[in-house]
């Protein structure tokens, strides 16, 4: 999470903007709002991970609610940043038509127009292992891009610019 490196990222992003470089950041947005408001002005395009639209379920599975994330996401949109919501599609968490409709309701409410559906994979398992953490998804199969087409269709039918993969 690049935005967790507050001092470094602030100086780094300032420098990039001074050089006229278009800055793209991928983030969970789970940082303090005041810091986010300061740093957002140095970022042109945001890829914003939104793991679940329901704060209770989000907290159950990630350990944190999504209120701070959604506050920062809404702020980025309010200052006219180019924002794409990225949804890591995870089995037994958010990979369902029912949850897709919950995302749609949330995204319409806050003004998201672009969505990337990211198929679940096992790439993160090694990171958990290196950190000595339990990986709760080791027995889950990867989700093929083909399996996301029905969810993509739901988003498209509801007026979103959507693609599978990022």
Q: What are these regions, as identified by a protein language model?
A:
Residues 89-166:
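Auxiliary Fe-S-binding modules of radical SAM enzymes
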């Amino acid at each position: 999470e690049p935005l967790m490196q507050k001092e470094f990222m602030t100086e780094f992003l300032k420098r990039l903007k001074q050089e006229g470089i278009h800055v793209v950041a991928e983030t969970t947005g789970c940082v303090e709002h005041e810091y986010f408001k300061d740093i957002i002005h140095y970022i042109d395009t945001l890829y914003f991970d939104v793991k679940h639209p329901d704060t209770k379920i989000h907290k159950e599975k990630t350990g944190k609610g999504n209120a701070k994330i959604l506050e920062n996401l809404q702020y980025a949109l309010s200052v006219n940043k180019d924002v794409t919501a990225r949804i890591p599609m995870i089995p037994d968490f958010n990979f369902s038509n029912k949850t897709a409709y919950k995302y749609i309701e949330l995204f319409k409410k806050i003004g998201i127009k672009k969505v990337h559906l990211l198929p679940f994979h096992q790439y993160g398992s090694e990171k958990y292992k290196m950190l000595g953490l339990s990986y709760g998804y080791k027995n889950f199969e990867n989700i093929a891009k083909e399996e996301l087409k029905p969810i993509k269709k739901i988003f498209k039918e509801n007026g979103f610019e959507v693609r599978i993969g990022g």
